[in-house]
Each structure stands twice: as structure tokens, then as C-alpha cells.
Amino acid sequence: MPFQKIVDEFALGSVNHSPAFFDIVKMQSFNAEYIRAMTVDEFIAACEVWLTGERAPWKQANYDAKVFAEIAPLVQTRVQLLQDVPSMVDFLFCEMPAIDEASYVKAFAADWAASTLIAIREGFKNCDWKADSLKAVVEKIGEQNSLKLGKLQAPLRVAVTGRSVGPPLFEPIELLGRDATIKRIDAVLAKKVS
């Protein structure tokens, strides 16, 4: 909200007499609303300081502004603070994502996790490299194994991003590319074997 609008709408009579406190959760909620109200171009510009320079958790040579511009609309709806953006997209700009151990253990606890991830890997080798086609491969494997898409996404997400939460999965996989995706799946499967 613009400062002048705040000044115009302030009324001393509306001030509550009870002790004031700073509500961080409410502030973050307001901030998230402000972020979602930005245009995508404004959001990209606001994120630049967090994505370039010393604050970024990747080598600057690995950062691609065009790739971020592609994923920005998906990230914009999921962050409350701009400082959270790098952790949502780091897997796109790091050679290999750090695997969150708790996410890994949870995603691979089921006996079907590794075998279905192998099947997904094989399906990804020859499919059209578009988000819809990638999703269709995973859905087909889910049908063959009587598993819903959400369950199958967990091991795949951990393999690709290193954690269990993030932006929608298939658009970032498309951006990451076939070779990098398969390399990450292989790495997490090797971890599973060891």
C-alpha cells in the first residue's frame, strides 16, 4: 500500500488501547499479498538483488535470467519474502542440488519409490521434453503401479530439486533439461543403492 494512502486512511480514533505487538506472521502475509500483486516483470526486477551477486547460493556463471523469467510466475505465488526466492530456484542454477536428508528418507521410504523412479527415468529418455509430456510419463507409470501422481512426484522432486517442496514440478524439469534431470535421478538412485 502506498505510504500516502496509509496516511490518508489513518484515524487516531481507530487505534486500539490494548498493548501493541509486532505480528511477524501477519506481516509476512501482507508481504506475500504485495508480492502477488506485482506484475511478473516487477517481481523479476525485485528478485534480482537476491539472484545475482554474493547473496546467490550458486556460481554467477550458472545463473540464467531467461530461465528465472520462465519460472518466476510459478515462484511468485509461493513466496512470502523475496529472500526465499533463491531457495525455491537454486536447483536450476546449481550443478547438483544438496539433498535434504529428511525429504530423501521420507520420499524413498516406500518400497516402490526407487523402481518407479527408474521407470520415470526410462520414460524421460525419449519423451517430448515439455511439461505436459513429462507429466504424462509420470501419470502413466502411476497408472501402471496403481499410484497417484502426488505420491510419484515425491521421489522425483527430491531427485531433481533436493527437497520435498517447491514450485510445480514439471515446468522446472522442462527448464532444467533432459541430461541434467537424468543425471540427478541417477545420482539419487545411486544414493539409494549405497
Task: Give, region by region, the residue ranges found by the protein language model.
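Small-residue-rich helix-loop
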Residues: 40-145
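Short, hydrophobic/amphipathic alpha-helical patches that form generic packing surfaces
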Residues: 29-33, 74-80, 158-159
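Structural motif
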Residues: 17-23, 61-70, 143-151, 164
